[in-house]
Amino acid sequence: MSFYSNLPSAGQSSRGSSTSGRNGVGLEPLYPTIFEIMSSQEIDSLLPASIRYLLANHLVANFPNRYTLRLNKYFFEWFQAIKGFVEWYHLKTYNSTFIDRFYGLQLFSSRDRNLALTQCLNPKGQSEWPQGLQLNQQQKSVIFLEKIILPYITAKLDEILEKISMNNIFSSDETENKWPKRAFLRIYPFIKKLLALSNLLVKLLFLTKRTGSVSLLQYLFKIEYTTVRPLSSELSGLKETKGMDNRLRKTNISSIFALMQGQLSIIPRFLTFMGSQFFPTFIFVLRVYQWWTTQDMTTKLQKRVNDLDEDIPRPPFSSHSDKTEDKEGVSEACPVCEKTVQNPCVLETGYVACYPCAISYLVNNEGHCPVTNKKLLGCTYNKHTNKWEVVTGIRKLLI
């Protein structure tokens, strides 16, 4: 992941851009490469599909009950709820989303342009991120809306659009009370394409290093991308007094508790480090596992297709059919009248006979084939007329 962070920015050598400030230096050194952002967005979109794949193929398939089925049915709802808590924690703590943080990405507020330019010019700006460039509450809410709420609403609207489209295909009646559905079919795809085009234009501006935003909402609310930097605290004065008191402390319960708390504070940092190492590995293993299972399923399907292509054995024939097959010219003669077939039809057993002969024979012989003597499924007995009837036992041939 750190490979992309070490790539030189294409806009660092450009001068006189719209983001330029003092001495011709702009905000280009702050922006990451487009590869980092696209990789992060791709993983963010693949993560729910991968988790649902594991849930459906292992938990639901091995333990099918009403709880696991409901868990799979309402997957998008509870997954978005959990993701919302995780994303809000990371936005509040790190000014970054869960996936972006593992790619070394961070969001900052570009409303104070002079402070951002000072951060580029000041060599010490690489050490910590000032409070004025951190996201405010409104900008964090916008990112939460873009990452959590809007994808959920879009997914539900896509489902409604698909249902309405399918209903219009299979139902031809159009009444006046369906005008909201017709308006939705016209307006929603147009708005969706318009937003996609707007996001594409913002990405083109990002490629030209005119902005650090990659979406329309980020561009409107002055939210831009940068690489991860430590955030400065509002109470930075406490850092100067920390560690100055080297006097002996009293060994009472409070001091012992404070000492243990200080020693245990390393656990969250350790868990964060392990998570940063485990998450990329988990994503890689998950993709390999999906590829492996897909290849295995493809092999099984190909094997089944090959088994179907094998020669199908002929069905067993009765002694009467064997005698009939030995007769000369049986393939061109009707098995009932033993003459040349006129007005041909085919029976369920695959043999051809004259249509009048076949009807007469089947009715008088309780629906049995004249060649194999097998009962035809298309011949039924009518209890009202006390006669056998040919329903679907034969088919006319057009020659």
Swiss-Prot record:
Zn(2+) binds at residues 334, 337, 354, 357. Residues 1-24 are annotated as: Disordered. Pathway: Protein modification; protein ubiquitination. SUPFAM superfamilies: RING/U-box. Signal peptide: none annotated. Residues 9-24 have a biased composition (Low complexity). GO terms for molecular function: protein transmembrane transporter activity; ubiquitin ligase activator activity; ubiquitin protein ligase activity; ubiquitin-protein transferase activity; zinc ion binding. GO terms for biological process: proteasome-mediated ubiquitin-dependent protein catabolic process; protein import into peroxisome matrix; protein import into peroxisome matrix, receptor recycling; protein import into peroxisome matrix, substrate release; protein monoubiquitination; protein polyubiquitination; protein ubiquitination. It is a multi-pass membrane protein. InterPro entries: PEX12, Pex_N, Znf_RING/FYVE/PHD. A zinc finger (RING-type) spans 334-373. Residues 63-67, 169-171, 306-399 are cytoplasmic. One of its GO terms (cellular component) is ubiquitin ligase complex. The keyword Transmembrane applies. Its main location: membrane. Present with 907 molecules/cell in log phase SD medium. Belongs to the pex2/pex10/pex12 family. The three subunits of the retrotranslocation channel (PEX2, PEX10 and PEX12) coassemble in the membrane into a channel with an open 10 Angstrom pore. The RING-type zinc-fingers that catalyze PEX5 receptor ubiquitination are positioned above the pore on the cytosolic side of the complex. This is Peroxisome assembly protein 12.
